[in-house]
Amino acid sequence: MAVQQNKKSPSKRGMHRSHDALTNPPLAIEPTTGEIHLRHHISPNGYYRGKKVIKTKNDD
């Protein structure tokens, strides 16, 4: 079992965790419907880059 030789100081602990922070997801606004969705993903209405690409339940 691995055991540390010396206690890690708060500064070193912070340096170790420096890459663990979460970033905000990249959001985009669909130009036709105005809905917010993840970039490079289809909006909830089935639109992608201004074109209808899939049928949804609300379609007639």
Curated annotation (Swiss-Prot):
InterPro entries: Ribosomal_bL32, Ribosomal_bL32_bact, Ribosomal_zn-bd. GO terms for cellular component: large ribosomal subunit. It comes from the Bacteria. One of its GO terms (biological process) is translation. The keyword Ribosomal protein applies. GO terms for molecular function: structural constituent of ribosome. Residues 1-43 are annotated as: Disordered. Keywords: Ribonucleoprotein, Ribosomal protein. HAMAP family: Ribosomal_bL32. Belongs to the bacterial ribosomal protein bL32 family. This is Large ribosomal subunit protein bL32. It comes from Nitrosomonas europaea (strain ATCC 19718 / CIP 103999 / KCTC 2705 / NBRC 14298). The gene is rpmF.
